[in-house]
Structure formats: C-alpha cells, structure tokens
Amino acid sequence: MRVKRGQAAHKRHKKFLKMAKGYVGARSKLYETAREVAERSLVYAYRDRKQRKRQMRKLWILRINAAARENGLSYSVFMHGLTVAGVELDRKVLADMAVREKDSFQKLAELVKSKVA
C-alpha cells in the first residue's frame, strides 16, 4: 500500500515557518531557508542560556566592585570581609543593594572595614 505523507510534511513545514516568523524575505517564506535559520536560532538560544548565567555574574561582580571602591575597599577585600563577618548574601543580592540601597551597602562596607582592620 502506498504511504501518503502530505499531512506530515505540511505540519512540519508549518512548524518551521511559524518559528521563522519575523525574519525578512526568503528566511520566513521558503521552507528550506526557514528551517536552517530556525534551527540555528535554537542553537543560539541554547548557547546563550548558558552564557547569560556567566554574564550576569560578571555584571554583579562589576557592580559590587564599583560600590565597594566608593567605600574605599577593593572587591576581593570586601568579599573576604563579608566571609569573615559571617554575612551570607550572594552576589546577586549584593549587586542589587549596591544599586538600589546604597545606605545598606555602606553599612555593610563599614562592617567589613571593622572586621578586616
């Protein structure tokens, strides 16, 4: 018996054309091209989900370092002082404090100075 695959092919084509929606020209109109760019976009998305974690950590460290230096401390001394003082705030929270709650961050810096000195 002959197997007709039109329905499956149509569904597959629609899936990739839907994923490629928003691209310009052939990238959103032709199945083969749309499939290539859609698959590539999935590769980028997978890779960048991993990179986002690294980039956010870098950003947090940068913000903490800037705020610590405003208070006369380097990043490494500040983080070491927090460990010695028994403060268990992660970098995400510290970076948020550095940006939004400068007074609280300044108090932490004073605590670190007293513990390190």
From Swiss-Prot:
Keyword tags: Ribonucleoprotein, Ribosomal protein, RNA-binding, rRNA-binding
Any Pfam family hit: Ribosomal_L20
The UniProt record lists the keyword Ribosomal protein: yes
Cited SUPFAM superfamilies: Ribosomal protein L20
GO cellular component: ribonucleoprotein complex; ribosome
Listed GO MF terms: rRNA binding; structural constituent of ribosome
Origin: domain of life: Bacteria
GO BP annotations, alphabetical order: ribosomal large subunit assembly; translation
Purpose of the protein: Binds directly to 23S ribosomal RNA and is necessary for the in vitro assembly process of the 50S ribosomal subunit. It is not involved in the protein synthesizing functions of that subunit.
Family: Belongs to the bacterial ribosomal protein bL20 family.
Name of the featured protein: Large ribosomal subunit protein bL20
Lineage per the UniProt record: Bacteria, Pseudomonadati, Thermodesulfobacteriota, Desulfovibrionia, Desulfovibrionales
